[in-house]
Amino acid sequence: MKIFSLLFSLFLLVSVMAENRIPAVHVPGSVGGTALCGEGALLYLAGEGKLQIYDTSVPSKPRKISELGGLPNWESRQILVHRGFAYLTARHRGVWIIDVRNPSKPLIAGTFDTAELATGIEASGDILFVTLRVFGVQIFDISNPVKPKHLNLHRTFEAQSAYCANGILAVGDWGNSTVLLLDASDPARPKQLSRIELDGFGDGVYIQENILYASTGHNSRKGTQKERKGAGHGLEIFDISNPRAPERLGGVKFPKFYSLGGDFWTPRPAGPLLAAADTHNGLFLVDVRDRRNPRITGRVILPEGNQKMADCVGGIVPGNGVIYLAGEKTGLFVAEVPESRPLPPRSGTLAVRTKSSAKEVPGFTRYECGGMVRRVRVSGNTVYAAASDAGLLVFQNTPQGLKEIQRITGNRIYDVDISGSLLVSAGNGFELTSYRILPDGTLKKLGSLRTWIPMQIVHLYEDGKIAAVSGGTGRVNFFDLNNPEKPVQKKYFAEKRILYIDVFPEQTLNGFLPISVHGMGLSWYHLNGTAAERLENNPSVQFHQLDGIAVLKDRFFIPSKRNGYYLLAPEDFGKAGLRKEFRADVPILGLPMWDGGKRLFLSDSRNGIVSEFDASSPEHLKLIRQVDVHPGTAGRAALLNGRLVIPAGFSGFYLENSKNSD
């Protein structure tokens, strides 16, 4: 009887929505994208490498007044206009700043790097919030709007979107199905006030007069695994008058749906209605005048994109009698909704109250680099730091400590690797650059190559003859460095999912190279000189996107998702090794580095902790110590004459004062 009632209710719900299908009119010439926002009578749409600005003086007929190229393409996620500047998140390509003070002539004013995938964007006064997925929320001082300064990185589970009102920052946390309420009145030191559980993956949030609207999607918390899948789509409403004790008022469910890729959802008030973008499900209009009993009054479904299903609804902007929708593939649409009204102007006034500071770690000296240190490499007595917007920095070891002897600027440097006297960097603008390390440790440029391929991770193999490169996409790229003055793209392979972080080991074993593909297990490659071959993919065991791989003696070491680890022999592509999971006395996670002897280091980037293990017996790792550099983001460790070197993102890098005797 219960099943019959549920099916009948679902039938009625779908029938009501079908009777209230609202047409949407396409705006010719508009680009496909998800990044859409409004400011006054203007609309800002970013996608396909462009920013388009529309005049909506006649609400039903947006008129394009300008278009700017040279922006990220599919990477663009969300856009916000604040004090005459548009801030556009672009995942691994950071945040882009566009000067829109003259809407008819927008100009790119700059870009800046973020600690992880720049996804959501929010601003209040002098403060900018960028949600970064598993690294949380990064907070910037934008009192100078074109030169943001890092203030803090507040860790959350998987931050997707954010909204700030009256000093309260609501964060839609994705995979753990929650909304976090933070006290952001002191932006450098946000404090969590409460954690709200949702019945669906968290994402878009909006605060209106102490009422929190939270859009949800993907899977529900309730029922069997089969019942939960795709049943998390909906809208939930909370009273946050007391942000430490939110009260759930009501909610409404949308039809079941599940598809990876275009998986984001957004709520925005539209007069007495609430407009909720729900990916390929379309846009739902919800009457929220009775917040304890909201009801669906209409639905907009976009035309098909390129997946034989309705296109994904990205950003939405309520207007006078209309709602504007961004189709991820199909462009801008206008739906007539007579009750709709524009959102009120923003009035946030947050400002920097205190300065955040990097941690001083006992036994270590911290070196500030002026940019986010993503990687350090060591050659002899010299340390090379890939310091993002600060460039490539070279430090010489002296009895008084490290001394900076060279700084190569002019490009954002994401990564660097060394083989013998060859150093190769991966930089912004899709640039691979090779250098010769001179006897004094300084660098002499040999050559460079600019391509259309994103480059953020680089590893050198086969005595520096070949470089493996990734850049936030699903491509594994190999470059021939036989002549380092003229790097040549040799071959590329397309994996099914993204290469999330540093997915490569630092060495191969007999030419075998496993890489971790997010959600798709291990792909095995074989290298021989400058030749690269993809052998097979084994998706049977999946790994966490922030864990890496290292050679450990005669096998590959990789953390499991259950705080253990595997030891994989290359001869059978690790199949036998995946049948036995080893354990240590502490959780095993992060980017591993083996010193070639008995020490193994694991850098937990998200939590800022580096763990050192005695790996004399790889099957029985023993913890020696842990070094906490939080709030820094610990990158893969290196050693300088036996002393630990830890890249720590916006905290610079740390060098151990003396060799650890344990």
Predicted region positions:
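Bacterial N-terminal signal peptides
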Residues: 5-15
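Feature marking well-ordered beta-strand scaffolds used for ligand recognition
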Residues: 17-662
